[in-house]
């Protein structure tokens, strides 16, 4: 069953530990909550002093933040968005999720107040801002990265890609997206 599949995937992907939560999180809110609960438990168990935790946005990462228990003792950690913001739902923004997790862990958090989709010229100007530069320096030193993998079609729409690009991705067999990269 699932344990055998977990072991196979661990071997194929070269991953030390992999957990499969049965069900379809798109159809069942309880599956998403369980994913959040398991992920937050793993994070808490692996934390060490001075960790820099990067987290992306999305419904799964919001579930991780929601299901994380408030720590009884503060952790000397920094939580930071691993990417800029995307879309308009506050609850699923990486900034919001980083703040919730940072507070629940009794640690610190930083915000990254830039959109996820910026033209190169605009990005070059924005990264000169000291606050943003400090956040980017922290991102470069993340030692725990927590990210979701989204459906390619849904993420292409959220990223407001041109219809031609979306069609091209779908024709190429794209099924998943992470960090703006699409996978078949």
What is the meaning of each model-derived region?
Residues 53-63, 86-87, 152-153:
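Gly/Ser/Thr-rich loops at beta-strand to alpha-helix junctions
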Residues 66-70:
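Distinct, well-ordered alpha-helical segments
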Residues 169-184:
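Glycine-rich phosphate/nucleotide-binding loop
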Residues 23-25, 51-57, 180-184:
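Acidic/glycine-enriched edge-of-secondary-structure segments
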Residues 1-4:
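N-terminal helix-turn-helix DNA-binding module of bacterial transcription factors
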């Amino acid at each position: 069953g699932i344990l055998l599949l977990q072991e196979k995937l661990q071997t194929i992907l070269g991953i030390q530990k992999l957990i499969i939560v049965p069900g379809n999180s798109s159809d069942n809110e309880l599956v998403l909550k369980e994913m959040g609960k398991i992920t937050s438990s793993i994070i808490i168990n692996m934390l060490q002093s001075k960790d820099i935790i990067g987290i992306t946005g999305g419904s799964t990462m919001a579930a991780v933040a929601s299901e994380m228990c408030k720590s009884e003792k503060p952790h000397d950690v920094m939580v930071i968005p691993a990417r800029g913001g995307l879309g308009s739902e506050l609850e699923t923004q990486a900034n919001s999720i980083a703040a919730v997790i940072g507070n629940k862990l009794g640690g610190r958090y930083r915000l990254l107040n830039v959109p996820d989709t910026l033209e190169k010229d605009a990005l070059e100007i924005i990264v000169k801002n000291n606050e943003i530069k400090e956040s980017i320096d922290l991102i470069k030193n993340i030692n725990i990265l927590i990210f979701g993998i989204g459906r390619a079609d849904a993420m292409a729409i959220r990223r407001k890609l041109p219809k031609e690009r979306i069609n091209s991705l779908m024709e190429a067999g794209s099924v998943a997206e992470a960090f703006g990269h699409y996978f078949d």
